[in-house]
Structure formats: C-alpha cells, structure tokens
C-alpha cells in the first residue's frame, strides 16, 4: 500500500511539473486583431517576435473589414487591435458606448489616388467618378488628398476630420464621388477608373504605393494605432506593447520590409 501511495504521489508530481513547464513555455497569451495585408504582416513579423521575447504567446487574427476588429476587442475576444486611427476609434466608441483606448502610433501606409484610366493628375477629365471610403474619417482623408493634389478646394470652416461634399467650394474637374466600403476600393481602380485607396488595402491587393497618381500628406490623427480596452490601461500588457513598438527590433523590420510607410515624428 505504501508503495502505491509513493507511486501515485510521484505520478502527480510529474503531471504537475509538466503542467507548470507547459505554462511557462507558452507564457501569457495575447490575441491581436489586424486588418489583412500589411498590418497583419506588421503584427506577425515586427510585433509578435518582440512580444514572444517578452514571454508572451501571441495569436494574430486577421480581418477583412473595419467593423469586426473593434467589435471583437470590445467584446473581449481580442486583447488589442491594429488597423485604425484615433478618430475612427473615437467614432466607434461614441456609436457603441465602448471604451477603447489608443496607446501608441505605428508606421502607416498612406492613402493614394489610383487610376486605370489616367497616367497623371492633369489627364483626369471633367466629370470623372472617384471612389472613396464610406466612413467619414477616411473619406475626409480622401478629400484632403484631392485638395493637396489641386483637384478640389475645401472650405476653411470645414471640420477637417468630418469633411463632406458640402464643404467643397471648388471642384475644378467636376468630380463625382462614389462611397464604398474600404475593402472594395482596390477593385474600383478598374471598375470606376479613379479610386482613393487606403494604403493597407492597396498593399494587400498587391498595388504599389509608387503607382498612385498622388499620395496623402498624412495628418498625425490619421496614423494607425495599437488599441486596447480601457480596462487594460496601466496594465503590464499595455507597457509591453508600447515597449515592443519602440524597440530596435520592431523598427529594423519596419525599415527593411515596410518601405514607404509614414512613421510617427519621433521615429523619423
């Protein structure tokens, strides 16, 4: 009987020891949602390795739209996401009574005006249709890009982060605007002829930033962020995410594999 007890104790110790080792090997799991394309790549190849060095087990979940990543984060299915700017996040919070918080900017691919019909801005004919993002924040980016290109003039009284057609005081080429979900905009380059495509969707569709007729002059508020739940502000996870983005390893990957991305000023 004494031998059986000793055997059982020994077996239990081995099981417990194995469980502890497995937990230590896996580390704390952190689940990050990212839009398909360059930001999923950034999460996988620039952010994940640094977090794993910090002891985390990292899971990356890819999304093909701008709706699911915030819903999943607000519902607790994600610990963080990487796809949006602060204005988009604030709009989601207001509309959904959520408490998402941005913690650090990341290098961001600029929006570009792409065309299958015209080779230069000067070639654009009067009355041409232009596709641009449906959501107000990113459509504002589109309008500002058109203004910087000299195609339209926006009223000085306009809210630069909520521009609509009523704010356009000069439309030199009588452009007509078609609003679409951001994920459809790469296809609109061929279907419509002119399309303002956010950089992440352009790259995900194997378009080159250099092929755009013009690229946006990115406002600080339009740079993408890592976003977490308000309850996690002040947590070790928040600190580790910030440290990962600020790390030399992260920025080496950005410099090598994400050329053309607009970097936060402190990183330039």
Language model regions located:
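Short helix-initiation/N-cap motifs at beta->coil->alpha
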Residues: 60-71, 158-187
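Ligand-binding clefts/hinges and TM-proximal coupling segments of bilobed small-molecule sensing domains
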Residues: 136-162, 242-268
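Flexible hinge/capping segments at coil-to-helix
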Residues: 24-26, 115-134
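A bilobed periplasmic-binding-protein/Venus flytrap-type ligand-binding module shared by bacterial periplasmic
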Residues: 110-122, 223-235
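Short, polar/charged alpha-helical segment
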Residues: 29, 37-59
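Ligand-binding "clamshell"
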Residues: 91-103, 116-118, 191, 196, ...
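Pocket-flanking alpha-helical
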Residues: 66-97, 119, 204-206
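Alpha-to-beta junction loops
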Residues: 74-84, 128, 151, 172-176, ...
